[in-house]
Amino acid sequence: MSLPALQNSAVFYRRIINRFPQDFSLAFAYGSAVFRQTGSSQGHMVKNMLDFVFAVDDPVTWHTMNLIENRKHYSFLRFLGPKQISSIQSDYGAGVYFNTLVPAEDRLIKYGVISTDALIDDLLHWKTLYVAGRLHKPVRILLQSENGNLRSALLGNLKSAVIASFLMLPESFSEEELYLQIAGLSYSGDFRMVFGEDKSKVSNIVKDNMQHFRQLYNRILQECPQVVYKPQQGRLEVDKSPEGQFTQLMALPRTLQQQITRLVDRPGKNRDVEEILLQVAQDPDCGSVVQQGISSIVKSSSITQSAKGIATAGLVKTVSYSTKKLQKMWRGWRRKPA
């Protein structure tokens, strides 16, 4: 499955991508410099840092080549060599290694490297919801291999986002409410939303990008047996019966199911997952339990990945990057009506 992507500026993005070793299974750009957000002008978009994620089959080989071609992108960790860099990438945080504040084509970029296997694992099971969460929202796909497992996982991740959102929404809701819920999944529990991010970030992402969200989710909603989708009215109705919610809970990614069982199961009872989810399906607070489960995943990965980012970026870049984030948060605060 190829996610929808904007077609303009193809040459610009190609020039940036060509600066790197080309062994990508997936390369995409995301964020406020790629998709306009409410309250940001074209001028702000051009000034914003461009964010990329590169999935690669062999991180050691990729970092080896990138250290030859782009050694200055790395912090002091470059002196450890590609094997140690790859170990830091895979063993800590969310399995992503970021280089930030990199000059390219008269812009500043940040790029994260993740192994294809780790990406597929996150897409299918929501182990960290770090990259999987970014892919719940519209992104610009730059390169995508023919890896069938990856394509299937990308689609599965979108379906999981829809199902999880159904569980947290009322019986009837608007298309915009659904996309707000989906866009907010990967920010739920993220400590950076308390300090360092614009508090209206989720709304800003959705308001100006409804058409991109429709492109991403329309077919899934049309084919989903759990929902009545009325695209002309922009309304949806979902099955909120215990049976319907149980079916949805059983379709959630494995890590989220495990988090839910930890929240609900009493110590020492050791009931199986199916029994616990059946109990949750009958609970009036089912949606709240799902929300807490997602928050626990995101909170853990956001803290550990941010801590790793201090080492991978280096102190000077960390201070500079954090300052830029705080400036964006300040602009968002100033835009709010009194």
Curated annotation (Swiss-Prot):
Cited InterPro entries: Tam41
Cysteine-cysteine disulfides: none
Pathway note: Phospholipid metabolism; CDP-diacylglycerol biosynthesis; CDP-diacylglycerol from sn-glycerol 3-phosphate: step 3/3
Cofactor(s) this protein requires: Mg(2+)
GO molecular function: phosphatidate cytidylyltransferase activity
Gene Ontology CC entries for this record: mitochondrial inner membrane; mitochondrion
Task performed by this protein: Catalyzes the conversion of phosphatidic acid (PA) to CDP-diacylglycerol (CDP-DAG), an essential intermediate in the synthesis of phosphatidylglycerol, cardiolipin and phosphatidylinositol.
Family named by the database record: Belongs to the TAM41 family.
Name of the protein: Phosphatidate cytidylyltransferase, mitochondrial
Lineage: Eukaryota, Metazoa, Chordata, Craniata, Vertebrata
